[in-house]
Amino acid sequence: MKWLFWASPPQDDSNSNSGAASQVKCRNNENVDVPAPSNAAPPSDRTISKVQSSSRDWNSIVNATDWKQFTEPRTIIPTALVTGGILLCVHIHRKYLRRIPEAGHISPSFFRRRSLLGKVTSVGDGDNFRMYHTPGGKLGGWEWWRKVPTGKNELKNRTIHVRLAGVDAPELPHFGRPAQPFSQEAHSWLTNYILGRRVRAHLYRPDQYGRVVATVYVRRWLFFRQDVGLQMLKHGLATVYEAKTGVEFGGVELERQYREAEACAKKKGKGMWKALKGGTKGEWESPREYKTRMAAEEGQKKNARGITRKK
């Protein structure tokens, strides 16, 4: 009711809906839609800078880097020295300082080319023993930084079984076989000579018993090292190893020295040669003859058992 003076005048649609689009009449009486202004705030300078930085050309960054500094001798030489030093340390550790736990872990490339330094932990017989590999010796930290285990549980599966090359000592009782004369003397001598000492074993080959055949040296007096097998021959507590196959001396020169030492001990009647020098040739038996006789007797016993079972 327009005549009522208190009536409110009609509101402008453009003010009531500011977000809606408006129409403008052009001269040719055509209506053109004009988008309404946005209520969003204008972007800040920080937003603009982020957008600009994200769209930056990375090629320009690479080109802007001064790569000449990486080709200068003052950069290349130290880098090459550090890299080469690291690779050299890794090579030395893998080849010389890595500990070998057992004979089965020795690489075939070691045989006749390399030697192992270790500490003797036990002596099993007159011509074999076990040693704990200590690569590098004292320079590798052993004895003052790294300790060699002493307990049986600690040493289990962690020692190398070594067979002395070129010699054969009297047999101790084992596998049901009786002890051979002078076997205890040979075992006691070897125990006193090398047990608890550091030895160096020059490796030749593995044998059928899981041992490694080697010429072993021990330092008894200052810097003078002694061939353990050769010393046993000189004391008459072993013979030169005699077999049809598998004989290992480590060279013609060592074999010559071994045979001369055996002949000298035999002539002087030392150790096990006492019985032979005393004229009891029939009672004397070499370790090789003893093994052959024991094998023959065991074979006869097996054959006798087989015949008895058939009956």
UniProtKB/Swiss-Prot annotation:
Biased composition (Polar residues): 11-31
Pfam families xref list: SNase
GO CC entries: membrane; mitochondrion
Entry EC number(s): 3.1.-.-
Domain TNase-like: 114-275
GO MF assignments: endonuclease activity; metal ion binding
Disulfide bonds: none
Stretch list, region Disordered: 1-53
Transmembrane segments: 76-92
Active site positions, chain numbering: R163, E171, R211
Subcellular location: Mitochondrion; Membrane
Binding site for Ca(2+): D168
Bilayer disposition of the protein: Single-pass membrane protein
Family the entry assigns: Belongs to the LCL3 family.
The protein's name: Probable endonuclease LCL3
Organism (species): Coccidioides posadasii (strain C735)
Classification of source organism: Eukaryota, Fungi, Dikarya, Ascomycota, Pezizomycotina
